[in-house]
Amino acid sequence: MSIEVSNESGMDISEPELISVARFVIARMDVHPAAELSMVLVDSATMADLHVRWMDLPGPTDVMSFPMDELEPGGRPDSPEPGPSMLGDIVLCPSFAADQADKAGHSLAHELALLTVHGVLHLLGYDHAEPEEEKEMFGLQNSLLEEWYEDLRRIDREAALAERDQKLLGKTGFVDGVDR
């Protein structure tokens, strides 16, 4: 899976974290592992321009998604497996997201992770124009975000256990479980 991030926002953003959450969601949604995604982080003026040009709405917004290939999560069990494709582009506006994060009482990193999940779901055809669509998309968005956080916690626990095990093995004279 190829995920490229271009930070043109002028803000210091953790690109590996954005890649991590995007990769997690793409995998959970059964998208072909060779799919490609592009993420661009822009300033408010650039986002406002995109928002007017593509949505005919004034001012900046938090996230916009531009799908490339028609993809659906999962797919029918009797259909041939889809090949790799270009999911599309997600455009994030960190400065706009920072204001939203402040209002919501959480970190910018959390807000950008949430918006990344949101953007990927839009690329996969989810929408929230109608109440039922919104309920489905936001429920899935929140579930995927929580699963990603749980996955990060699991990885941290495993790393801590591995480090502890190495220390214990070192004290006993065993290294990597091999008797010297």
Swiss-Prot record:
| Protein's cellular compartments | Cytoplasm
Q: Which domain of life is it from?
A: Bacteria
Extract one GO BP annotation from the record: rRNA processing
* Cofactor(s) needed for function: Zn(2+)
* Molecular functions per Gene Ontology: metalloendopeptidase activity; RNA endonuclease activity; zinc ion binding
Per UniProt, the cofactor note for this protein states: Binds 1 zinc ion.
- Any one of the GO CC terms: cytoplasm
Its EC number(s): 3.1.-.-
Instruction: Print the keywords alphabetically.
Output: Cytoplasm, Endonuclease, Hydrolase, Metal-binding, Nuclease, Ribosome biogenesis, rRNA processing, Zinc
**Pfam families in the cross-refs:** YbeY (PF02130)
Residues at which Zn(2+) binds:
H118, H122, H128
Main subcellular localisation? cytoplasm
The function of this protein is: Single strand-specific metallo-endoribonuclease involved in late-stage 70S ribosome quality control and in maturation of the 3' terminus of the 16S rRNA.
Family, similarity comment:
Belongs to the endoribonuclease YbeY family.
Q: What is this protein called?
A: Endoribonuclease YbeY
